């Protein structure tokens, strides 16, 4: 299988997102990279499912709460930007204050 660098990046995000999802299910608080991967993977999947940029910008703020991440993580993530593939092309999705 010959993957482009972009495809490798998406695969890495998805894999890290799965690890984060499993840790959340066990009640483990997520650290910075896990929280980033969890939200990013959800945004990428939402785009593939046909959600709009505006819907994803809102959705990204509902995925994690302060109680689900380690202390200090919300302050480390003022925004997340993901290049997602939509049915009509690639667009940048920006989520401000993703962990409230």
From Swiss-Prot:
One annotated GO biological process: urea catabolic process
Transmembrane segments: none
Pathway: Nitrogen metabolism; urea degradation; CO(2) and NH(3) from urea (urease route): step 1/1
Enzyme Commission number(s): 3.5.1.5
Top EC class of this enzyme: hydrolase
UniProt keyword annotations, A-Z: Cytoplasm, Hydrolase
Keyword Cytoplasm carried by entry: yes
Native organism taxonomy: Bacteria, Pseudomonadati, Pseudomonadota, Gammaproteobacteria, Pseudomonadales
Pfam families: Urease_gamma
UniProt subunit comment: Heterotrimer of UreA (gamma), UreB (beta) and UreC (alpha) subunits. Three heterotrimers associate to form the active enzyme.
Primary location group: cytoplasm
Localisation per UniProt entry: Cytoplasm
Gene Ontology molecular function: nickel cation binding; urease activity
Reactions accelerated catalytically: urea + 2 H2O + H(+) = hydrogencarbonate + 2 NH4(+)
Taxonomic superkingdom: Bacteria
GO cellular component terms given for this protein: cytoplasm
Protein name per its UniProtKB record: Urease subunit gamma
Protein family (similarity comment): Belongs to the urease gamma subunit family.
Claim: Hydrolase is one of the keywords in the record: yes
């Amino acid at each position: 299988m010959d993957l482009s660098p972009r495809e490798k990046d998406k695969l890495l995000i998805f894999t890290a997102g799965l690890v984060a999802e499993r840790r959340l299910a066990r009640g483990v608080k997520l650290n910075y990279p896990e929280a980033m991967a969890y939200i990013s993977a959800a945004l990428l999947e939402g785009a593939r499912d046909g959600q709009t940029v505006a819907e994803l910008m809102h959705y990204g703020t509902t995925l994690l709460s302060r109680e689900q991440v380690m202390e200090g993580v919300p302050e480390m993530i003022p925004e997340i930007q993901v290049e997602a593939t939509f049915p009509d092309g690639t667009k940048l999705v920006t989520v401000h204050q993703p962990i409230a």
